[in-house]
């Protein structure tokens, strides 16, 4: 059985590799992306920095809206006179059956859009999985 210090060293290496991998992925995004921005993803535009006093477009002290004035009740209308009964209509002639319409041709399926290329410096599967693989190898080697 290996000494306890080797187990602790393996756990330390595992943790260090994970934190380093996350740090490298965050650093790859670039210094201009640090901090919160409002506006979300746009068409290549950067969002504006969120300040401490920013209320996300809402007024912190809204003015109360004036209450609407009650409308006067309308006067009741006189009841209309009953209409005389209409005469029964003659039975309509049966319509000839329409010819069935030919089925429309199915539209060709649009070509699937190609996957967009990742932004330069964005975290990829390789940049995230590499620290996990190194840390796992260190754990296996220690035990």
From Swiss-Prot:
Subcellular location field: Cell membrane
Prodomain residues: 122-143
Protein name: Procyclic form-specific polypeptide B1-alpha
Topological type in the membrane: Lipid-anchor; GPI-anchor
Signal sequence, renumbered to the chain: 1-27
GO CC aspect terms: plasma membrane; side of membrane
Biased composition (Acidic residues): 60-118
InterPro entries linked to this entry: SDr-like, Trypano_PARP
Protein keywords: Cell membrane, Glycoprotein, GPI-anchor, Lipoprotein, Membrane, Repeat, Signal
Protein purpose: Major surface antigen of procyclic forms.
Region (31 X 2 approximate tandem repeats of E-P): 59-120
Glycosylation sites: 56
Skewed-composition ranges (Basic and acidic residues): 31-52
Keyword 4Fe-4S in annotation: no
Species the sequence originates in: Trypanosoma brucei brucei
Sequence repeats: 59-60, 61-62, 63-64, 65-66, 67-68, 69-70, 71-72, 73-74, 75-76, 77-78, 79-80, 81-82, 83-84, 85-86, 87-88, 89-90, 91-92, 93-94, 95-96, 97-98, 99-100, 101-102, 103-104, 105-106, 107-108, 109-110, 111-112, 113-114, 115-116, 117-118, 119-120
Region (Disordered): 28-125
Residue positions bearing lipid (GPI-anchor amidated glycine): 121
